[in-house]
Design a protein with these regions (language model features):
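Inter-motif core of Ras-like GTPase G domains
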Residues: 66-87
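Beta-strand-loop-alpha "switch" segments that mediate conformational coupling across diverse proteins
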Residues: 117, 127-158
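Walker A (P-loop) phosphate-binding motif
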Residues: 1-31
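Short beta-strand-centered segment that lines the nucleotide-binding/catalytic pocket of NTP-utilizing
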Residues: 29-44
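Switch II (G3) loop of P-loop NTPases
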Residues: 36-40, 52-72
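Structural beta-sheet core signal
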Residues: 34-35, 81, 110-113
């Protein structure tokens, strides 16, 4: 079983949304998965479940540093770190990068730069991240009202607004996960 850990010390950065979108992708591909929700806020659209012989386990974490986070990081086959691109997100992001540095190169770590838009602040953040952490693998997820609209309908943005930029970004993130972890359709 492949384990995908979605983590960041900061809340409100899109961990649960990404977790749900990965679940939708696995459902489309008919891949058996277990879902573990360590975040007590209950923000997931999908219900927590443990499935016998699951091919993938997805772990959604809370927005706070916990002692057992290191254990989850060690157990994960892939780590996804969503972050917003604001000044307030810099310190928590740098703490996460520091925590994950011992695992860099040993397991895939994807930093999802969430709510990307065309403002100078976003461009400056992206440039800062690229200059200071060029070794980090990143993906962009655009700022869009379609994600919460899709969530309100208990749908993936890929099904709700398939031609949108947000859907394309989610497809790219999911394709990276599938390729990196060698997840195949119908994998059980």
């Amino acid at each position: 079983m492949k384990t995908i850990l979605i983590c960041n010390q900061k809340g409100g950065v899109g961990k649960s949304m990404l977790c749900d979108e990965i679940c939708y992708g696995l459902e489309r591909d008919q891949v058996k998965f277990s879902l573990y929700d360590l975040d007590q806020q209950g923000s997931l659209t999908h219900e927590e479940k443990e499935v016998d012989n699951a091919a993938v386990a997805i772990v959604d974490t809370p927005g706070a540093l916990q002692d057992d986070l290191t254990k989850w990081i060690e157990a994960a086959d892939m780590i996804i770190v969503p972050t917003l691109m604001t000044r307030k997100d810099l310190a928590p992001l740098e703490r996460m990068i520091k925590i994950l540095q011992p695992f860099e190169g040993k397991k895939p770590i994807l930093y999802v730069l969430n709510m990307y838009d065309r403002t100078n602040m976003t461009k400056d953040f992206y440039k800062w991240f690229d200059e200071n952490y060029p070794e980090c693998t990143t993906a962009i997820l655009t700022r869009t009202t379609l994600l919460p609209q899709a969530d309100a309908c208990s749908m993936s943005i890929v099904d709700f607004a398939p031609r949108s930029t947000g859907a394309e970004h989610i497809k790219n993130i999911y394709a990276y996960i599938k390729t990196t972890l060698n997840i195949r359709e119908g994998w059980r």
